[in-house]
Amino acid sequence: MNTTDFTKKTGMVETHDGLKLYVVRNNASAEPKAVLIILHGLANEHSLYDVFVHPFNQQNINVYRYDARGHGKSEGKRGYVKSYWEMAEDLRVIVNLAKQENPGVPVFVLGHSMGGHVSALYGTKYPNEVRGIILAAGVLRYNFMNIGWLPRPEDPEEYINTIDAAYGTFHLPEWKSMKTFSAPGDDSSLTEITAAILNAFKETIQWLKDNCRTFTNSVLILNGNHDTSVTPQDAIDFYQQTGAKDKSLRIYAGVNHFLMNDPKGHQIAGDVISWIEDRLGNEVYEDAGI
């Protein structure tokens, strides 16, 4: 299938509190066997995964991407959130949209980095509303984060350079040489974010840790061992502590934080597709092991 052999539809969808989110649907040309919703990371937007979606369409999996509130073409104060619960409720709106537009088709969620954090919150609060969840370099614990530094000293609505903000919140001295918190070549990400969006991690990371046994969704947890933003130990901790019976953990050698944009991105896409296909028509798998 050529990369043009799918349909693309864009639009705005209203959230639970009246904000409008920008949604991009890449639908396969044939009858879909699944729908995959992708949520991006902090300061990024949906377009970061333009190339990543093609293999899914080729396997008749419709892909829904959207810009989180305050990011990309979605409404909301730039780089700001009061609480990540707002984003978790937004994700639920997109899940319901995908179900309405694809009746009877299994829905999966893939969240990257901040999107992984939001996806884990959603899956814990609303167990098994989707067939499975993929957490890619998700912010799930705080092995790298200087959590004691939060809240940051700035006014919550004050803007901070994204790299400076991240450097002050993580143990990551090499970030000093970075120009933007994104994959190489991306110029669409926010260069400034508010202190509030960093502060908000403290509450919900602790909540995920306290409620880990409540997460029972089928879950695929992905990380690169060269990730200097979210340590693989976060993924290992979540894997070991989650209440899910069907859980798999994959740590990719030589892969960094933006693993879907990594040279091994095609391999990662293939692994996600295989994992999704294995779960079509199956409600519960036993522990798949590491």
What are these regions (language model features)?
Residues 253-290:
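Catalytic active-site module of serine/aspartate enzymes centered on a nucleophile-bearing elbow/loop
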Residues 43-46, 72-102:
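Catalytic nucleophile-loop/oxyanion-hole region of alpha/beta-hydrolase
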Residues 112-194:
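Alpha/beta-hydrolase-fold enzymes
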Residues 217, 231-240:
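Short alpha-helix in the alpha/beta-hydrolase fold that links the catalytic acid
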Residues 226-230:
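Acidic catalytic loop of the alpha/beta-hydrolase fold
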Residues 215, 221-223:
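Short beta-strand/loop motif that positions the catalytic acidic residue
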